[in-house]
Amino acid sequence: MQTATMIAGDGSKLFTAYRLPDGEPRALVLVVHGYGEHCGRYRHVIDALTERGYAAFTLDHYGHGQSEGLRAYFDDFDRPLVDLKAYVDSFRPQYPDKPLFVLGHSMGALISLAFTLRHQAEISGLIISGAPVNADANVSPLIVALGYALNRIVPKLPLLSLGDSSILSSDPEVGRAFDADPLTYKGNMRVRLGVAINDTAKAVRERLPELQLPLLIMHGEGDTMVNPSGSKLVYERASSADKTLRIYPDMYHEIMNERQRDIALGDILNWLDLHTA
């Protein structure tokens, strides 16, 4: 992958990366990573995309990976949406006639949904994996209420545990690699980010009927980190005439890092092929 640094609106340095296929790209794919991780964990996804003829672009969110900022934190969900738009605007003019697809996982799927709702006319299709659309489904109401109270006092306090890395994938090597990776965040989720995710999930749920573009919605049936009910809700409420829901038995949260990852990756590639034919 080719890497670069993007200067965000507030002057922060954000890590970006891209890979181009041999020859003219069939389409552009923006890959949006999740909470506490970084875009380097999607190298195999990006490789698969470019080998199939797609140009793949990605970045580390503010506070994540090799980008600047307090680890695993931003003040509100507008931050990654603005950063993504600035990044897209930096490469889109080079490919004005190519369709743009967005592929997001976990918190990145929620970011992708909010981003698509804001810029739907500019996007040809959306692929989401493990989307926390029902963000509070796995959190006790007491913790949710406590989070909102603490947000006014200690917004950067690490509060919510999301579980250990063993719940990411049924492949134990994935969890071990996550734990050993110096660019991943292993602490508890900070109060304000948890509140921002919950608020954004509520806003996205209310606006799901506005989605009209092609959708591929994916979730592991064995996901205990993010309840699959959110992905089912996207499928039920989106107005898109072209929408597909894939629930994968025996897969956990990171379907693209599962033992059967080739199944999920194959579904992504085949769906893209169908929508660029």
Segments (PLM) and residue ranges:
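N-terminal cap/lid segment of alpha/beta-hydrolase-fold proteins
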Residues: 1-23
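Short beta-strand element of the alpha/beta-hydrolase
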Residues: 26-34
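Conserved alpha/beta-hydrolase
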Residues: 46-69
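Short beta-strand/loop motif that positions the catalytic acidic residue
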Residues: 211, 217-219, 223
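Catalytic active-site module of serine/aspartate enzymes centered on a nucleophile-bearing elbow/loop
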Residues: 244-277
